[in-house]
């Protein structure tokens, strides 16, 4: 017998008459009797009903958005849209009409043929009026390539060089793997746009991006005059491009941008492809978009950044090789953008691609000074970025260093990659690096010099091939470079973010150089016969302690004046290393664990509140104000002269601290801006007597910088608050590790390995996806059989 159909809900009339209802609208009984048929809404619904309702609402939302975008972006079609709306045409029909006239899914191959063709050819420069017609048809193809490398195509993740995603802790990572944009060609025709093609990106569509008003000054070198073109198909809004360029060149890590601002901006305005290209401009704009803090609209910020970066990668993929200067610079800028997103593996691949392009690029010896400077900054900056990443991640194998790396990937040994040829090429590249340093500006040169000195020694020490004499030489090079740095720059209260970052990196280099020798120098090749005698009889443990303190102090100064909401790309790694070293000096790890668990990032966000105030105020105990620091005994005998401004002020201060930690009248003018102070000098201190320091320090000077304590527990608290206030993936993971200090503290040291750490952590180590572990804990990957060379 067939199963009888059940009606889940009868109409009101059939329910009242207690007759059978077929559930139709109107039902058969009401229709035959001519009665009004009505249903009472059910009090419960199945999941199928809810899914249908959700899908219906989503369709209505998409239709409404399509109509709104059309009204906003296409002034010439307003009358057509309004006439259809006034004609009571349904939103669904209007949305279908918009999609038909926009041809949303036109073939990407036809669209990509409009972009820059040959190598070195000048790009197609569109005026705002010319770009309007072509922009909406080109945007979706640019956005489609925002997924190359680390974004999504449909449901699959496409890594840069591997068929499967990689982990930062995998032991088979090889920097010799070439990054080939050519391999991404299969995705060029994937018709899966991330954004509607009709959407135009402009400053008006980003209302919450903190773009400064046009009346406010830009970075020197970027004038308020309208730009003649934008060099990008993503937007024709010249004002937006102007603001993003200003944002990029004013970034706190601009010394690592590898791009001379004056040469680039001149080429940008004149359409000169020698210093500028579409790929480089898109990379710069994407990096600038992603550097905005959380105060900006996260959706708009990411949409802009992904679109610009995706277009840069697409343009680089169309190049047969990257032998021109702008392409090499674009790869390096993309690497910095990936670092800021916490994507260390992608940044690693892009940085190596930049170095490989710099090596294979033909060098011209008869060039003007402007091009020599641009080439030197790009060449040395690319190598320095790799050196930094290797120091921060423990990938110090000598065979895979930039100077001795393989140029080609494959099972067969090519003549260029034979060991002897790699050694000869390594010496030649190192000599070229030293020659290019002569053309670099003073600030980048300082960073390049100390990084190369520390990286060279660390690479040989990694394979147990370094000697005590080489350690002394590397340490001496760092001190000499800092002395020249101090003589060149006035390290006063008006210091720039770049100067602060350079000093933080200098102290991290000292920490990375001497941390393996705090307990023992047994890893040195001649340690049994020779004990390293550092300049001024310096002690590695004292230097590491003072350097870690200096990193935290300088970061606090940076936070006070520039905010840590969006920090320089590598700052979280260095700060975490300093905090972890202070953990090893802390006698009570349980107390630290309690502090780390009570971290409240919002306490350190104020530009006026000092980190030390926030750290101790978080516990509601006003009696925990740190005491005055102890004078540096025999300071000049083991610490490089001169000191950084913060440490220098700490040495000079001995007067009791007043209740007010900052004197607003002496620090800020009526407009809220910092006033320069001539009472704070950068001269080297010659007196260490407390009475002399007290008499030479004024109240204004005493209140000008935060007063810090050198107690390890207090420094860990301050550093933890600083990390918690950073909007950075590595800082988030570092904060999570600091909450486990009670279990990690006894393991921190030069002999720590990943297996021991994995057993000690209270959470799976696989949850940590960046290189912050290697940075803070001083970890190094297991060395392979060393190449038999004697380094430059």
Swiss-Prot record:
Asked if the keyword DNA-binding belongs to this entry, the reply reads: yes
In terms of Pfam families, this protein maps to:
Zn_clus
Positions of disulphide bridges = none
DNA-binding feature ranges: 11-37
Tree of life domain: Eukaryota
A GO term for molecular function: zinc ion binding
Localization, UniProt? Nucleus
Q: Where is this region: Disordered?
A: 662-704
Question: Would you kindly state one Gene Ontology biological process term found in this protein's UniProt entry?
Answer: sporulation resulting in formation of a cellular spore
Keywords of this protein's UniProt record, alphabetized?
Conidiation, DNA-binding, Metal-binding, Nucleus, Sporulation, Transcription, Transcription regulation, Zinc
GO terms for cellular component? nucleus
Regions of compositional bias (Polar residues) in chain numbering: 678-688
Recorded hits in InterPro entries, A to Z, give: Transcr_Regulatory_Elem, Zn2-C6_fun-type_DNA-bd_sf, Zn2Cys6_DnaBD
Question: Matching Gene3D superfamilies, A to Z?
Answer: Zn(2)-C6 fungal-type DNA-binding domain
| Cited PROSITE patterns | ZN2_CY6_FUNGAL_1, ZN2_CY6_FUNGAL_2
Q: What does this protein do?
A: Required for conidiophore morphogenesis where it has a role in the budding phase.
Q: What is this protein called?
A: Conidial development protein fluffy
Tell me what gene encodes this.
fl
């Amino acid at each position: 017998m067939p199963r009888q159909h059940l009606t889940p809900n009868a109409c009101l009339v059939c329910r009242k008459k207690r007759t059978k209802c077929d559930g139709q609208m109107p039902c058969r009984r009401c229709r035959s009797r001519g009665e009004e048929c009505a249903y009472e809404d059910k009090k419960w619904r199945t999941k199928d009903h809810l899914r249908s309702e959700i899908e219906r609402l989503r369709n209505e939302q998409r239709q409404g958005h399509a109509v709104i975008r059309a009204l906003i972006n296409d002034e010439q079609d307003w009358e057509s849209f309004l006439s259809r709306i006034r004609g009571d045409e349904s939103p669904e029909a209007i949305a279908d009409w918009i999609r038909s006239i926009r041809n949303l899914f036109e073939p990407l191959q036809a669209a990509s043929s409009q972009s820059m063709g040959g190598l070195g050819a000048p790009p197609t420069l569109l005026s705002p009026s010319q770009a309007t017609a072509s922009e909406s048809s080109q945007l979706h193809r640019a956005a489609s390539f925002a997924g190359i490398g680390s974004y999504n195509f449909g449901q699959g993740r496409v890594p840069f060089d591997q068929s499967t995603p990689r982990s930062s802790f995998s032991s088979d990572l090889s920097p010799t793997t070439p990054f080939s944009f050519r391999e991404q060609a299969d995705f060029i025709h994937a018709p899966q746009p991330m954004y509607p093609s009709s959407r135009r990106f402009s400053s008006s569509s980003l209302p919450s991006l903190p773009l400064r008003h046009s009346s406010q000054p830009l970075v020197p070198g970027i004038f308020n005059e309208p730009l003649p073109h934008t060099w990008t198909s993503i937007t024709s809004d010249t004002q937006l491009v102007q603001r993003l360029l200003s944002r990029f060149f004013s970034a706190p890590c601009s010394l690592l941008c590898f791009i001379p601002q004056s040469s680039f901006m001149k080429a940008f305005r004149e359409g000169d492809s020698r210093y500028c290209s579409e790929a480089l401009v898109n990379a710069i704009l994407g990096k600038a978009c992603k550097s905005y803090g959380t105060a900006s609209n996260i959706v708009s910020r990411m949409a802009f950044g992904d679109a610009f970066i995706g277009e840069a990668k697409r343009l680089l993929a169309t190049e047969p090789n990257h032998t021109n200067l702008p392409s090499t610079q674009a790869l390096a800028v993309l690497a910095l953008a990936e670092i800021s997103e916490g994507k260390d593996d992608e940044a690693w691949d892009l940085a190596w691609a930049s170095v490989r392009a710099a090596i294979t690029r033909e060098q011209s010896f008869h060039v003007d000074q402007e091009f020599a400077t641009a080439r030197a900054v790009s060449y040395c900056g690319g190598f320095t970025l790799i050196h930094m990443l290797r120091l921060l991640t423990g990938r110090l194998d000598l065979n895979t260093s930039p100077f001795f790396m393989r140029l080609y990937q494959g099972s067969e040994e090519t003549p260029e990659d034979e060991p002897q040829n790699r050694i000869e090429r390594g010496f030649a590249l190192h000599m070229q690096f030293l020659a290019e340093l002569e053309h670099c500006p003073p600030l980048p040169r300082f960073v390049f010099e100390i990084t190369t000195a520390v990286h060279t020694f660390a690479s040989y020490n990694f394979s147990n091939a370094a000697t005590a004499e080489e350690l002394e030489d590397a340490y001496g090079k760092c001190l000499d470079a800092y002395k020249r740095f101090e003589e060149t720059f006035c390290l006063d209260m008006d210091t720039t973010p770049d100067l602060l970052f350079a000093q933080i990196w200098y102290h991290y280099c000292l920490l990375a150089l001497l941390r393996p020798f705090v307990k023992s120098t047994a890893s040195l090749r001649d340690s049994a016969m020779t004990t390293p005698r550092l300049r001024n009889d310096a002690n590695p443990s004292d230097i590491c302690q003072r350097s870690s303190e200096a990193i935290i102090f300088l970061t606090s100064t940076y936070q006070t004046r520039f905010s840590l909401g969006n920090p320089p790309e590598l700052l979280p790694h260095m700060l975490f290393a300093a905090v972890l070293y202070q953990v090893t000096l802390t006698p009570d790890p349980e107390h630290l664990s309690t502090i780390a668990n009570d971290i409240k990032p919002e306490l350190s966000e104020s530009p006026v509140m000092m980190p030390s105030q926030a750290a101790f105020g978080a516990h509601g105990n006003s009696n925990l104000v740190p005491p005055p620091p102890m004078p540096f005994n025999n300071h000049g005998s083991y610490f490089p002269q001169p000191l950084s401004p913060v440490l220098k002020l700490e040495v000079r201060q001995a007067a009791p601290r007043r209740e007010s930690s900052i004197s607003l009248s002496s620090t800020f003018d009526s407009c809220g801006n910092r006033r320069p102070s001539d009472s704070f000098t950068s001269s080297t201190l010659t007196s260490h007597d407390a009475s002399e320091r007290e008499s030479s320090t004024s109240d204004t000077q005493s209140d000008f910088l935060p007063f810090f304590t050198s107690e390890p527990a207090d420094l860990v608290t301050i550093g933890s608050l600083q990390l918690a206030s950073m909007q950075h993936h590595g800082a988030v993971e570092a904060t999570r590790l600091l909450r486990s200090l009670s279990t990690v503290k006894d393991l921190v040291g030069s002999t720590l390995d990943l297996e021991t750490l994995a057993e000690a952590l209270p959470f799976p180590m696989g949850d940590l996806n960046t290189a912050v572990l290697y940075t803070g804990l001083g970890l190094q990957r297991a060395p392979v059989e060393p190449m038999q060379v004697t380094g430059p």
